[in-house]
């Protein structure tokens, strides 16, 4: 499985907003209505294509509970992208975004791409946070925004892929130092500058001298 | 330092006292001195004392030293001393002064560790020292953290986890260019990650897999030293029981990166020397690492995914070649077999590959056969035999095709007298005198038919030729005979397990079993016997289980032992209580629980072998049903007597009976619906059986068609091998040739020079030769001149007397001579020009070799000059000759003028010539 780039993501946000379900929907294309509480972090991976290039996403799904905060903080530094998730049916999860963002900005590298996600868009009837509010928050803090539903899979692909596109663009713009793996980006094995075999330009003409 | 010197000179008991005093005074100096130098000296002295007076230094200096760490961190030296002091008082490692430190009890270091980590800030302080690059700070910090982790692992893990970037900082140590720090960091990370899934995940997130695998590779993989061992231990720490990390490991393509480490170079010299102990350890750990990824205890999808990758990247192939390689130590081989087992277990693709592996023997045999040969061989190490059985089981696990292939080798149709088959080996093992072989073979056979009714029926067809003259006996009957003959515990348990597995879910086998009337009485006698130890109890329990199975899967074809008959016998002869008791003893046995834990046979001693994992599963699933079959619906027995009755009694009875009738009707309805569904399922099952049979036939046909192909391909392989061999030989030859050629090339230049020298020498000699020739030519010319002079004088002298003809003749002769000389000269000239050309050529060669060039050119130029002068001389000579010619012409004309006949005598001519010459002179 060769790839051009490898991006490391983390998923953060309050407990119960659907982080693990988003990951499961993205990696396994299925929805699990009753999901165990995440303990610490769980890992998932998938290959996507951007601009005709294979990109491997390695995703660490973190526990939302406060007690795991110290553990999840360790993952900020090495991540290239973060999905910050709240639940549109629970206002408090939206209110906590500022804390999450501060935490993320403090511990991550400054170039980390953050995607704000309002999850559970299928539960329109129980909506407590308007889409406009999410958009406004994202605009204010320079984030990308999207509403998703891990249950119906609406926008789930897009959320992960758009984040990757943003990172990819930053690489093209030279913002990321791609040789520093601590940024959560790695160049694929076959794309690293390999030593090309040089063609030696002919051995000097050794003819002549036999003209008599 | 004075104090210190005093201490060293003091006797033992005084030493302790004065030691404490010294420590006290040093502590005071550290805390009160305002000068950094003084403090540093005092801390250095404390460090020196800290090994010998751990208790004193630990109790008195801890806070003071912590203070130093906090406030003197600009001075690397004092920090280093303080950290070393901490290390000494925390470390429980035995030192040179072991007797002294032991006085304080065993876990002094642990107690100090507790005090130290009571304030979590102390640990953060230590972690912050890791930012310091100075070796005197970083190294002792790593050592101190390691010893703290060793002493109080759980507590410290929690503290480090909470410190921001704590784990990340420790991970960064792996990139330290100083090897000693990197290596100690490996030990530190090993302690840090032990049993803590969250830290394991963070460490993995920090690219641990990549970095560790890089270190392993840089250190020479399995040929590397203890650092490789530490790396492999760390990898295992990170992966064991950590599904998330395992998934990451697989997704990060790290399995592929492990692959090169498994390539064993089959060098002849390594065969003689053997494997170093370190290499054996490294290989062992590497294999265990693979097993961690495909362990049957992992989540199944995880294991399946890893198995697939291992096949695709060629890791399984490498493992199989280690299996078949020579010179591999027995314990590595055993672990390799275990590893192969778990890589193929339950994975159809990998099992198929394994079945195709051939051992490099003559003729090539399937690896499975070669392995089974070891299994039934008493001389092989016990653990190796266990591993082979595990491998065989894993090969057959969820592998109906494999099962049928094995059973096929037992059937008479497929019998091939020449080659050894798995079936022959299993039968041999089953009836060998070695109880362990009996056990291994029966369990192996059990796995060939487990959960596979078709193969159970096929196995019934197996007939054995016992001895000459007597009729063949079926395998089933032979097993029963052996069982009834007694024998060792493992033999009987093995036989009972295969019989239980065989008869379960297979009514035909049950009826075969019951047809021999000796079997049931034997079982009854075993179960009803009350004597015996723990082991006999197992046998009795298994006999009860077998009896239960005979009831459970009884199709009532045997009249003597129909379901009801059996029940009757059991209840009368054994009793329900006793039967239940015997049956339950099986599961209560310690070896049963041990075997039920995991499929891997992790026995250390042959005596530990009792139960098989697969059998425990069978037992678990059928135990209750057997009990139900034996005890349930036992209420059929009607023991009531009808006594003197009243109307009420009759009414009651009637009501009871009516109720019963109702119940029975319901029961009948239930049973009818059951029967209908059962019929349906029977039809379906029959269809399935038919399908399976068809498939089987198809497979057989395929197999038949495949086998010639495979023989052809083996021929092809042989010829290819031969070709490869010859090519290799050619390669070798050409190699030798190229070597000699290159040698020649090396010597080429000096040779060329010498060749040139020789040519020059030759040229020189040639030139000398030509010089000589020219000289001789010149002398000849002189002579000719003289002769001419003589002639002219003669001519002039005898101008009147000598006849012209003579003169003419002489002239002709001289002309001829001259012609000869000119020819010779021309010839020489030609040679000279040729040599000139040669010289030019050589000049080209000379130019290429700059060393020799100057001399050669100079010489050559000299030669040229010489030659030029010679040419000039020759030219002169030519001119002279021309002059002579002219003169001769003149003489001729003169002679003619004189009227003398040219045809005169030579003498006259001479005289005339002399005369002429004289005349000329006179002119």
UniProtKB/Swiss-Prot annotation, chain A:
GO terms for cellular component: endoplasmic reticulum membrane; endoplasmic reticulum-Golgi intermediate compartment membrane; Golgi membrane. Signal peptide: none annotated. GO terms for molecular function: GTP binding; GTPase activity. Keywords: Endoplasmic reticulum, ER-Golgi transport, Golgi apparatus, GTP-binding, Lipoprotein, Membrane, Nucleotide-binding, Prenylation, Protein transport, Transport. Pfam families: Ras. The keyword GTP-binding applies. Residues 201-212 have a biased composition (Gly residues). GTP binds at residues 13-21, 61-65, 119-122, 149-151. GO terms for biological process: protein transport; vesicle-mediated transport. It is a lipid-anchor. A lipid is attached at residues 211-212 (S-geranylgeranyl cysteine). It is found in: Endoplasmic reticulum-Golgi intermediate compartment membrane; Endoplasmic reticulum membrane; Golgi apparatus membrane. A motif (Effector region) lies at residues 35-43. Its main location: endoplasmic reticulum. InterPro entries: P-loop_NTPase, Rab_GTPases_membrane_traffic, Small_GTP-bd, Small_GTPase. Required for protein transport from the endoplasmic reticulum to the Golgi complex. Belongs to the small GTPase superfamily. Rab family. This is Ras-related protein Rab-2. It comes from Lymnaea stagnalis (Great pond snail). The gene is RAB2.
